[in-house]
Amino acid sequence: MQLSDRPLTAPGTAPRQATVSRRTGETDVQVFLNLDGTGRCQADTGIPFLDHMFDQIASHGLIDLEITAKGDLHIDDHHTNEDVGITFGLALAEALGDRKGIVRFGHFVAPLDEALVQVALDFSGRPHLTYGLTLPTERVGTYETQLVREFFVAIANNAKLTLHLRQLDGINSHHIIEATFKAFARSLRMATEVDPRRAGQIPSSKGVL
């Protein structure tokens, strides 16, 4: 049974989940996510390192994810990496809906051995990425490290969030990237939590996001 076939929310609660498909001449991507999950993940993007990073998002963000992608990997990973980020961002936006009642802001500092990365985000409705990672190698395995920035640009633009990634320490590319994804996951979990004191209100003094 697929994750998307299972009852993933408590009885009487509105499901904060989405299924988004996106097909282009270069890729075919499907993303299912449940913001109120338990950290289950089934990711098959054709890019093993990216699948590993989605495991981190699911596990540390307590998001249930089901992701499949078929792309022109015979050329390189760029199109698939970006389009998976786009589709994931669209699914986040759909699952959040009008964003009523959420905390909105999230931040976390994650260590992984010598690496230390800070992430702060705001579901502001204003897409922005400040990227402050310095990755010392061009690849981790077969994954091009320059694709990390493209992945987060795609998420920020399509989930309409403001995202800051700041590397505080680190010399190992794998550790830096994984710490970034873990910190992003925890920030995402914080920002998307429902604040009972909001009572379904838009978390903005303007009344709109």
UniProtKB/Swiss-Prot annotation:
UniProt key word Ribosomal protein: no
Keywords attached to this entry: Amino-acid biosynthesis, Cytoplasm, Histidine biosynthesis, Lyase
Record localization: Cytoplasm
Primary subcellular site in the record, as a coarse category: cytoplasm
Residue segments, region Disordered: 1-23
Pathway where this protein functions: Amino-acid biosynthesis; L-histidine biosynthesis; L-histidine from 5-phospho-alpha-D-ribose 1-diphosphate: step 6/9
InterPro entries associated with the record: IGPD_sf (IPR038494), ImidazoleglycerolP_deHydtase (IPR000807), ImidazoleglycerP_deHydtase_CS (IPR020565), Ribosomal_Su5_D2-typ_SF (IPR020568)
GO CC entries: cytoplasm
E.C. number(s) listed in UniProt: 4.2.1.19
GO MF term (any one): imidazoleglycerol-phosphate dehydratase activity
GO biological process: L-histidine biosynthetic process
Reactions catalysed: D-erythro-1-(imidazol-4-yl)glycerol 3-phosphate = 3-(imidazol-4-yl)-2-oxopropyl phosphate + H2O
Residues that span the membrane, as ranges: none
PANTHER family: IMIDAZOLEGLYCEROL-PHOSPHATE DEHYDRATASE (PTHR23133:SF2), IMIDAZOLEGLYCEROL-PHOSPHATE DEHYDRATASE HIS7 (PTHR23133)
Family named by the database record: Belongs to the imidazoleglycerol-phosphate dehydratase family.
Protein name, per record: Imidazoleglycerol-phosphate dehydratase
Species this chain originates from: Synechococcus elongatus (strain ATCC 33912 / PCC 7942 / FACHB-805) (Anacystis nidulans R2)
Upper lineage: Bacteria, Bacillati, Cyanobacteriota, Cyanophyceae, Synechococcales
